[in-house]
Amino acid sequence: MDIFKELILKHTDENVLISPVSILSTLSILNHGAAGSTAEQLSKYIENKNTPKDDKDDNNDMDVDIPYCATLATANKIYCSDSIEFHASFLQKIKDDFQTVNFNNANQTKELINEWVKTMTNGKINSLLTTPLPINTRMTVVSAVHFKAMWKYPFSKHLTYTDKFYISKNIVTSVDMMVSTKNDLQYVHINELFGGFSIIDIPYEGNSSMVIILPDDIEGLYNIEKHITDENFKKWCSKLSTKSIDLYMPKFKVEMTEPYNLVPILENLGLTNIFGYYSDFSKMCNETITVEKFLHKTFIDVNEEYTEASAITGVFMTNFSMVYRTKVYINHPFMYMIKDNTGRILFIGKYCYPQ
């Protein structure tokens, strides 16, 4: 969650959405061509962020496996100057994730990249690049993701109604509020020193689900953002139990108008030697080369039938006795994760401003 935490510090009052799996996959591609301290930094970061230690095998393969979900398309690619001759061993490892281009033809290269991203995301992300890349660009890494999964228990369209969404205590807007009643879902209410919050796990068909973290206080999301870590998230989710839930959840759609440039964030997290003078990609080619851009863009559409660009898991149990139903109203800023049934987070975002 380190990249996500860095981003939300920079985008305090904005919707944020990233795919950790996609970013990690792209870093793994770079690692195939890295040497020296660049390879050491990449390998260490990937090992720490990849499969949990107790699930790791003994091989040294650094590729990030994308777990099975309903339909998950990852768009990760490296674009490099056509004037550079790359090692055959590197090209063999990365296969279709590499393409040479003429960066002097900036507009054509921009359109080439955007068309590829559009194809890989089924048209949900139309343009990764809004402006041409500088003609002195030697290498660009792009990352885009598309996922679509049907809800295990779809929301009833005829129950959707217009309701209030509190951006803050003083700012209110309206949203289309979806309703799902009498479903047995994984739920827990957590009390921490920094505030209380609810966690609910909403399953999709297959092996994925969406986890919502909803603060009790309308303006309480900031405190959760400060304390969210992989360890805390696992600890909180370990307390989930099955409850009968009446769920009120807004329809929402998020598409970044501009891609995130993750270069400064990755540098802050210790990956200083992928960029600039000290980068060593000598396993890619014999020339000195460095990463100029690391772009990442995502899209999500949550409605009554499905979530597009996200995925996560749920456990369901039948209770035959009389049950008190918990009502969960998601009517103010919240955090959400989309994970598979191994616990790996495919997407993580916060929603604070209806578009």
Swiss-Prot record:
<keyword id="KW-0646">Protease inhibitor</keyword>
<dbReference type="InterPro" id="IPR042178">
    <property type="entry name" value="Serpin_sf_1"/>
</dbReference>
<dbReference type="InterPro" id="IPR023796">
    <property type="entry name" value="Serpin_dom"/>
</dbReference>
<dbReference type="GO" id="GO:0030430">
    <property type="term" value="C:host cell cytoplasm"/>
</dbReference>
<dbReference type="InterPro" id="IPR000215">
    <property type="entry name" value="Serpin_fam"/>
</dbReference>
<keyword id="KW-0722">Serine protease inhibitor</keyword>
<protein>
    <recommendedName>
        <fullName>Serine proteinase inhibitor 1</fullName>
    </recommendedName>
</protein>
<dbReference type="InterPro" id="IPR023795">
    <property type="entry name" value="Serpin_CS"/>
</dbReference>
<dbReference type="GO" id="GO:0005615">
    <property type="term" value="C:extracellular space"/>
</dbReference>
<feature type="site" description="Reactive bond">
    <location>
        <begin position="320"/>
        <end position="321"/>
    </location>
</feature>
<comment type="function">
    <text>This viral protein may be involved in the regulation of the complement cascade.</text>
</comment>
<dbReference type="GO" id="GO:0004867">
    <property type="term" value="F:serine-type endopeptidase inhibitor activity"/>
</dbReference>
<dbReference type="Pfam" id="PF00079">
    <property type="entry name" value="Serpin"/>
</dbReference>
<keyword id="KW-1035">Host cytoplasm</keyword>
<dbReference type="InterPro" id="IPR042185">
    <property type="entry name" value="Serpin_sf_2"/>
</dbReference>
<dbReference type="InterPro" id="IPR036186">
    <property type="entry name" value="Serpin_sf"/>
</dbReference>
<comment type="similarity">
    <text>Belongs to the serpin family. Poxviruses subfamily.</text>
</comment>
